[in-house]
Structure formats: structure tokens, C-alpha cells
């Protein structure tokens, strides 16, 4: 499985992307070496449940769809996505926080944004310790 995943990732475009759309797992891994990265994973049929993360500061924000034919299955498998939307936070290449929708296929926007902002603040504070 890992060999297949590595081969699949090698064939995907790694850095050619629109500003907020994930094209490969390698892209997130490269970006997250230096900064906080947040990836919101959803499905085309559930996009109305996306949370607007564009106002968050000090963190790169990306969206990914499990329906994307080139990489959707790889993302869902590699990141063990069980429901959509799922928001995953990375710091220096490691997952530090995950928010997953329940049976409603929605996340509580206010609670999630508060928790994400608190996590970003913690990341920023750690830079000065």
C-alpha cells in the first residue's frame, strides 16, 4: 500500500495548484515544514457545509475534495477521513488537530473557529519559547 501511495504521489502534480486547492499530499508536507497548514476536506455534494477559513491568519489554508478523481481517494485513505467535512491542522509536517463532522455532515462553525484560532495562537507562541 505504501509503495502504491508513493508511486501515486510521484505521478501527481506536487506544486502546481490554485491558491487554495490541494493537488497532492506532498504539497501539504512541503508547505508544513515551515508553517501551520490547515486542510479542509469535503465532498462535492457537501460543499455547503464548508467553513469559511479565509480570515484565519498565520496559517496556510487549503481545501481538498474526496471526489477529485486524481487524488481524492489517496487523500481520504492517507489521512483516514471518516466523514466530511474534516479539518486537519498540521504544524511542521505533523498533524496536531482534527475536527470531524458527525452524522449531520456539518461542523459547528463558531466552536471550530475558536478552537482553530486558539491552536494557531499556541503555534505562534511556541516560536518565541
Kindly give the residue locations of the regions a language model identified:
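Active-site-proximal beta-strand/loop segments in catalytic clefts of secreted hydrolases
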Residues: 41-44, 66-67, 102
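Non-catalytic, surface beta->alpha helical segment in thiol-disulfide oxidoreductase systems
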Residues: 89-129
Amino acid at each position: 500500500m505504501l509503495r502504491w501511495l508513493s508511486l501515486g504521489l510521484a505521478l501527481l502534480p506536487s506544486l502546481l495548484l490554485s491558491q487554495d486547492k490541494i493537488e497532492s499530499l506532498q504539497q501539504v508536507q512541503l508547505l508544513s515544514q515551515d508553517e501551520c497548514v490547515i486542510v479542509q476536506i469535503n465532498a462535492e455534494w457537501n460543499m455547503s457545509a464548508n467553513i469559511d477559513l479565509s480570515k484565519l491568519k498565520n496559517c496556510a489554508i487549503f481545501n481538498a475534495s474526496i471526489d477529485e478523481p486524481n487524488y481524492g481517494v489517496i487523500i481520504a485513505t492517507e489521512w483516514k477521513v471518516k466523514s466530511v467535512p474534516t479539518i486537519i491542522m498540521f504544524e511542521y509536517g505533523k498533524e496536531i488537530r482534527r475536527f470531524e463532522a458527525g452524522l449531520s455532515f456539518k461542523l459547528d462553525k463558531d466552536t471550530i473557529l475558536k478552537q482553530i484560532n486558539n491552536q494557531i495562537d499556541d503555534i505562534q507562541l511556541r516560536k518565541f519559547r
